[in-house]
Amino acid sequence: MFVILMSLLLVTLILSGCKKDTPTLYVYNWGDSIDEDVLGEFEKETGIKVVYDTFATNEDMYVKIKSGGSSYDLIFPSDYMITRMRDEGMLEKINLDNIPNFKYIDKRFVGQDYDPTNEYSVPYMWGTMGIMYNTTMVHEPVDSWDILWDPKYRKEILMLDSQRDSIGAALLKLGYSLNTTDPQELEEAGRLLKEQKPLVLAYVVDEAKDKMV
């Protein structure tokens, strides 16, 4: 789901601060993605200063960049957000000649619908969404999305503060495709999330895993 290759750090540096004594690379990434020690080592080895900001959701990232308040050399939007930002002229094309290791990326992850020619993005990370639960409190088999709508867990349910993921969970519960564009199916998913709202304690991002410790 997550895109833009980390090795672009070595390429994008040409674009930033080239007129300054110390070149600077401006990076905007998901929280908990890169250890600060790694950034420090990169700065020592290359002499390039990294200004590293993080975001919690694609929507937070989009709003900040769209507002024009910040400009970054390297960002990490998810698949659907790449399409949106590309269509709105918010992304620069990538010169793949500067990324020789691109040819080693698994072919399953290149040429996707959101960027068929990989002109604007390079695969960086892939993953799926699942259900995390405390086995000391939930003893029944968790084999369906239905459990997130079970009234007996009222105010003990945390949902991702992400439109894509929350709507996706509702679509899967309904038996629809994650990538449906059918207005009726999306409307059904929206209604299902509204019905679920009284059961939800909070809509969170990284806080979910902290509460499980």
Describe the role of every protein-language-model region.
Residues C18-R84, K209-D210:
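Early extracytoplasmic/lumenal segment of secretory-pathway proteins
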Residues M1-I4, Y62, Q112-Y114, N118-E119:
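Hydrophobic alpha-helical segments with strong N-terminal bias
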Residues S71, F76-V213:
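Extracytoplasmic ligand-binding site segments that recognize negatively charged/polar headgroups
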Residues M1, K44, L91-I94:
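Glycine-rich, phosphate-binding/catalytic loops in enzymes
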Residues L8, I14-C18, V63-K66, S121, ...:
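Short, flexible, glycine/charge-rich loop motifs used to bind or transfer phosphoryl groups or to couple energy/partner
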Residues M1-L25:
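Short, low-complexity disordered leader/linker segments with a strong preference
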Residues L5, A56, H139:
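Conserved phosphate-coordination/catalytic loops
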